[in-house]
From Swiss-Prot:
Entry binding sites for Ca(2+) 2: D67, D69, D71, M73, E78
Keyword Metal-binding: yes
Sites where the protein binds Ca(2+) 3: D142, N144, D146, E153
Protein source organism: Arabidopsis thaliana
Keywords: Calcium, Metal-binding, Repeat
UniProt entry tagged with the keyword Membrane: no
Residues bound to Ca(2+) 1: D31, N33, D35, R37, E42
Cited Pfam families: EF-hand_7
Segments forming domain EF-hand: 18-53, 54-89, 93-128, 129-159
UniProt protein name: Calcium-binding protein CML39
SMART domains: EFh
Gene3D superfamilies recorded: EF-hand
PROSITE patterns assigned: EF_HAND_1, EF_HAND_2
Amino acid sequence: MKNTQRQLSSSFMKFLEEKNRDLEAVFAYMDANRDGRISAEELKKSFKTLGEQMSDEEAEAAVKLSDIDGDGMLDINEFALLIKGNDEFTEEEKKRKIMEAFRMYIADGEDCITPGSLKMMLMKLGESRTTDDCKVMIQAFDLNADGVLSFDEFALMMR
């Protein structure tokens, strides 16, 4: 269970360190059915979107870890508790992992994440998203409003 929390922490904590709005954005993205709660299945699918594998048992354990009210789901406060585990990576390791993730989402010959490359990667991961969905996802972190994510923008999003 500690390994599951560490895995969740390393993948999602980078997303959430900047501001509370990042937490809300990640939560909203993971809450696929928009009911204000994240189920173990939604957690597992979102994890897969980030290029990580999570078993049904790990997803259930992760939800139970922070499910304060015992409803089998995570509200935004419980989700915040889940991801606040110890982040044991050095800055160099964090940057390397972020670069590895970034490379997964860029098309050959490109140096940025485009709506098309994001859509393609999500399809490979079993997530069906429209190009418009991908544009919205990119827009949330596109600091210079050029319609794509540079490595620096991606790194800020992941921290």
